[in-house]
Amino acid sequence: MNREPHSRPLYQAADLRRIEQLAADQPLMERAGLAAADLAACLSGNPGQAVLILAGPGNNGGDAFVAARHLRQRGFAVHLVFAGDAGRLPKDAAVAYQRFIDDGGQPIHEVPSAPSWGLIIDGLFGIGLQRPIAGVHGALVRAANALADRAGCPLLALDCPSGLDADRGHCRGTTIRASHTLTFIAGKPGLFTGDGPDYCGAVTVAPLALDAEQWVRPTA
């Protein structure tokens, strides 16, 4: 993983979606979730700590399901809040959801009380949202921000903090304020411009075994 992403080419969200389509035969979601679990384990510290994971209704939620499965296997006390409908998940996310269930995971639908969270993971929307976050999802974003502040724990966003425009770097209303962001395949301009630096924290790129420049020309 690259911890100096600003020194590498940046890609618009549409370009990243194109790369994902071209590389659809590769296990990108599994790679993303494993990379997330690796970074989460480093941030959280000792196994056994309580980890709160917010999983949304799309592929960002799928990445969260994979990360949750790997963290459970490493001994972390994973509490996964699923804010979606399992019957309407995209194909790869549905597979990740079922593997989490088959491994003994139990999704919940409300944030539980915990003595102390060791880490919170935002897997609600990433770069996939084109509108302000509202309703139950907005409530989860506000809860995650408040809990991270209260516990003084890291808040890790997957790909892009939910609510932040990955291309332009402005917030669409309620937005995750991450201490760390693990972005996949390549960096996005909005992580480093506008509101991005204040909401992304430390940005790390997980290339997922892809060289983005071989697929699409970078934006910058």
Q: Where are these predicted regions, by residue range?
A:
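An N-terminal, well-structured beta->alpha segment
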Residues: 1-52
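YjeF_N-associated NAD(P)HX repair module
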Residues: 2-17, 23, 117-220
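Charged, low-complexity, helix-prone segments enriched in Lys/Glu/Asp/Gln
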Residues: 18-21, 93-100, 218
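Nucleotide and nucleotide-moiety/phosphate-recognizing core
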Residues: 37-126, 132-158
